[in-house]
Amino acid sequence: MDMDKDRDLFGTEIKEMLRESIQRVVKGSFSSHDDDPVFYTRESYPGKTRIEELPLYPKGIPDVIRSWANLYAKTNYAPEDILVLDLETTGLGRGGTLAFMIGLGYYEGDQFWVEQIFLPDPDAEEHSFERLQELMRERSLLITFNGKSFDVPVLEARLLYHQIWLDI
């Protein structure tokens, strides 16, 4: 009896059961990576609210935010320039903390898209950054809630760990 072989087979069966369970409950799909795929969800919303057709995106960024975020170099950002980012993590520290969910929001045409990238297994972490990299190359303004003090430092640490170079 080969214990390592049995453990690998058992682990693979558990992962498959987990993937099937997730897909039954949550609308989304797994990435095409044979080894350690990540789970993606994607949903679009109209670019206007239901109350008096108010836009989700304001015409201008208030001066106090512009000053705090050092955005005076460029005065007009189009909705398509924006990428909203939020992380859900395994802890509050920077070292050893994994982002088990990367939440992304962005405008495409008259729709606001929300994507969530779930990490079903820590081994899939490197794959979880692929969509983030793609969207960050296309957009010039990153909006976060705790980005300066938490999300960006966590991302930088995890990207460095995987030797992925991304200018955040």
Region roles according to the model:
Residues 112-168:
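Conserved DEDDh/DEDDy metal-dependent 3′-5′ exonuclease domain
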Residues 75-77, 91-96, 163:
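Hydrophobic, well-ordered secondary-structure scaffolds
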Residues 80-90:
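Two-metal-ion RNase H-like nuclease active-site motif
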Residues 93-120:
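RNase H-like nuclease fold core
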Residues 51, 93-98, 129, 154-155:
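Short, conserved acidic/polar surface loops in the N-terminal third of protein domains
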Residues 1-78:
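N-terminal accessory regions of nucleic-acid-interacting proteins
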Residues 78-79, 96-98, 136-140:
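Short, well-ordered loop/turn elements at secondary-structure boundaries
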